Amino acid sequence: MNTQFFEEYQTQLLDWQKKFFSTWMESLPKGTAEIKLTDTFETSLKLQEEMVKSYLEAQEKSATMMIDAQKQFWDNYFQALRQEPVSAN
């Protein structure tokens, strides 16, 4: 069987990882470095809530991308097997 599909899967996995981290970093609230210890409890709580929400959104997107990549991989795998000639003994 051709290793092209496995190489394609590895490429898709790498792309998925890049998209996951870029999505997560983009969704983090801006200006987190400006938060001081003297901020109120409510401000800290809101920041934590935003971070959890953004992390969960990134997880959801990454799970969807990973499932799509796995579907594509297995579709390609079975398609390649169907194209291989069957040897008759």
Curated annotation (Swiss-Prot):
Poly(3-hydroxyalkanoic acids) (PHA), of which PHB is among the most common compounds, are prokaryotic intracellular storage compounds with potential uses as a renewable, biodegradable thermoplastic. Cyanobacterial PHB synthesis is particularly attractive as cyanobacteria use CO(2) as the carbon source. Residues 39-83 are annotated as: Helix 2. Disruption phenotype: During N(2) starvation fewer PHB granules accumulate per cell, while their diameter is increased by about 25% after 6 days of nitrogen starvation. Decreased rate of PHB synthesis, however overall accumulation of PHB is not significantly different. GO terms for cellular component: plasma membrane-derived thylakoid membrane; polyhydroxyalkanoate granule. It comes from the Bacteria. Residues 3-26 are annotated as: Helix 1. Homotetramer. Nitrogen-free medium induces chlorosis in Synechocystis, leading to the degradation of the photosynthetic apparatus and concomitant accumulation of cytoplasmic polyhydroxyalkanoic acid (PHA) granules which in this cyanobacterium are composed of PHB. A phasin, it attaches to the polyhydroxybutyrate (PHB) granule surface regulating the number and size of PHB granules within a cell. It probably also acts as a regulator affecting the biosynthetic activity of PHB synthase in vivo. This is Phasin PhaP. It comes from Synechocystis sp. (strain ATCC 27184 / PCC 6803 / Kazusa).
